[in-house]
Amino acid sequence: MCIRDRYYDLKETDSLAHSTAVQVSREIGRRIVSGNYKPGDLIEDEVSLSERFSVSRSVVRDAVKILVGKGLLEVRRGIGTRVQERTKWGLLDNDVLAWHLSSPPDREFLRQLMEVRLIIEPKAARWACEHGRDKQLAEIEIAQTRMEEEQSSIEDFVIADALFHRAIFRASNNEIMRAMEGLIFSALLSSIRLTNKDPRKNKESILFHRKVADAIIQRDADKAEARMESLLGDAGHRLKKQINTPKK
């Protein structure tokens, strides 16, 4: 399963679109986010796109409407369909976040995602202590145990890591916080592609996660918040080293 599909799986969203228009929109969207189409570029006309994807022109029109709704495209009569500036994209949209995972790592985007995580996740850990039900806290412990069991596998460890953070978000019992979990999944899956290439280093990460889990299970909100900050500080340090490594 590719990393993009892992994102949809974590979000409990079907990565296989049932609508042909959605499938086409996702393919065009991936090309926009990956930079094949750049802001200001005109994409192909309806006829060309319908031939490329072997679909009707009405399907292409519906696909374009989907991308207009996500802020990626604009349609101008007499000019064509143009890619919008990145500042107009719906960056928190589930598909847009997933499309980033299909693209080469965007180091600036990863840096910004980590900054947001540093603001959000320590509070999520605190609220999990304060508002989480016993069953939800048990899910956090289960997820952390799974990380220990999967430490020899890069791919399985990544999923266990994401499930750990998802369990904390959901234990916060804050609807707004839960609505932002897609952002965290994208940040996790994107950054881990760079920082978690050697399974032998998973042991270092497990210790940070174990300390967070212990604090939450003990419902020690101050300690949980501080330990999550330490966990993210370590992750941010490793990510920064990768970001600052010259591209070959």
Give the positions of each predicted feature.
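Surface-exposed helix-capping loop/turn segments at secondary-structure junctions
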Residues: 36-40, 130-135, 221, 243-247
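A broad structural signal for alpha-helix termini and local helix breaks/kinks
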Residues: 53, 172-173, 243
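Juxtamembrane/interface motifs at transmembrane-helix termini
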Residues: 16, 61, 132, 157-161, ...
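C-terminal effector-binding regulatory domain of bacterial HTH transcription factors
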Residues: 4-14, 222-248
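Short linear motifs at protein or domain termini
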Residues: 4-119, 126, 246
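Conserved amphipathic alpha-helical segments that form helical-bundle/coiled-coil interaction surfaces
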Residues: 113-194, 205-209, 213-214, 223-238
